[in-house]
């Protein structure tokens, strides 16, 4: 079966901007009543709007692509929902729900497609700032439906070097245990003048927006654990189209699946210097203090 990825990208862009985005923008900051997904010692928030938007997306893609599978954050069932080789939409109706609840204008919808478990279409839309970032395999990246001159941006950023980089991090919703301790210890090493000595950290509160910003050349890398496939699927495709790489958060995890749960995403380099990326990744891993592991 031949799949027209460019057409799917166009369809998802229209879905994001015309149907999903207006809901996110109009309802931001209005959801004072919300649920915690995993108990009182977590801050993993879900609102009624998350569920409403996912239902809208599901109905739209099922109408247009009835044979494709669908995985959404709010309909995911642990131990039952699996990614297969079949064409599968993997979506996060509202990525950055905490931002959404607090009316901080960095929530978005993240719409991805995998084929043979590989992210091949990605669409990320932040309606608050009207930013649409999209890509499909072999077709490059677009920003607000226009081809993006990422090479010029990379030239202005210079070489990819750990101690000259700005790194995106997120502590996550779980604030105890070994994973949390590993994150805190790693943050300290990345900042320390004796180890990573990075220029600084940024936390955008949205994995999808973070990966979009890496693809556009505004951040150098993103290290996180605890994410799910719907957090990174769209951004993964977009980043790869501009020469970026996604590996595991733990040292030695050079090849991972989209549902790995731990990730290190790195921007592209001038002239696609893979050795430069490899050194950056290795230097970054040398700052990882512990091991991230999620069920």
UniProtKB/Swiss-Prot annotation:
Known pathway: Polyol metabolism; myo-inositol biosynthesis; myo-inositol from D-glucose 6-phosphate: step 2/2
One Pfam family cited in the UniProt record for this chain: Inositol_P
Function text: Responsible for the provision of inositol required for synthesis of phosphatidylinositol and polyphosphoinositides.
Entry's family note: Belongs to the inositol monophosphatase superfamily.
Keyword Cytoplasm: yes
Name of the gene this protein is made from: INM1
Keywords: Cytoplasm, Hydrolase, Lithium, Magnesium, Metal-binding, Nucleus
Additional comment: Present with 2440 molecules/cell in log phase SD medium.
Regulation affecting activity: Inhibited by Li(+) and Na(+).
Primary localisation category: cytoplasm
Protein name, entry field: Inositol monophosphatase 1
PROSITE patterns xrefs: IMP_1 (PS00629), IMP_2 (PS00630)
GO annotation, biological process: inositol biosynthetic process; inositol metabolic process; inositol phosphate catabolic process; phosphatidylinositol phosphate biosynthetic process; signal transduction
Enzyme Commission (EC) number: 3.1.3.25
Signal peptide: none
Top-level taxon: Eukaryota
Binding site for substrate: 73, 94-97, 231
Cell location: Cytoplasm; Nucleus
Organism: Saccharomyces cerevisiae (strain ATCC 204508 / S288c) (Baker's yeast)
């Amino acid at each position: 079966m031949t799949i027209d990825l460019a057409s799917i990208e166009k369809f998802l862009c229209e879905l994001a901007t015309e149907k999903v985005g207006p809901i996110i923008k109009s309802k931001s900051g209005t959801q004072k009543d919300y649920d915690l997904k995993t108990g009182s010692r977590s801050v993993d928030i879900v609102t009624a709007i998350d569920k409403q938007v996912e239902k809208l997306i599901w109905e739209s893609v099922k109408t247009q692509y009835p044979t494709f599978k669908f995985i959404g954050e709010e309909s995911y069932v642990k131990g039952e929902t699996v990614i297969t080789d079949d064409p599968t939409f993997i979506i996060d109706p509202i990525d950055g729900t905490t931002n959404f609840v607090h009316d901080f204008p960095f929530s978005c919808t993240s719409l991805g497609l995998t084929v043979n478990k590989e992210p091949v279409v990605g669409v990320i839309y932040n309606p608050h700032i009207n930013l649409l970032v999209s890509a499909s395999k072999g077709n490059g990246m677009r920003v607000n439906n226009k081809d993006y001159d990422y090479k010029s941006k990379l030239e202005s950023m210079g070489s990819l070097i750990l101690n000259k980089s700005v790194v995106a991090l997120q502590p996550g919703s779980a604030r105890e245990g070994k994973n949390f301790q590993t994150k805190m210890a790693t943050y300290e090493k990345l900042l320390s003048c004796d180890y990573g000595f990075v220029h600084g950290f940024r936390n955008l509160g949205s994995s999808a927006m973070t990966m979009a910003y890496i693809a556009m050349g505004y951040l150098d890398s993103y290290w996180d654990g605890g994410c799910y496939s719907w957090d990174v699927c769209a951004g993964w495709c977009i980043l790869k189209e501009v020469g970026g790489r996604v590996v595991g958060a733990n040292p030695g995890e050079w090849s991972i699946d989209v549902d790995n749960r731990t990730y290190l995403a790195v921007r592209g380099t001038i002239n696609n210097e893979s050795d430069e990326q490899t050194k950056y990744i290795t230097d970054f891993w040398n700052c990882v203090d512990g091991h991230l592991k999620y069920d």
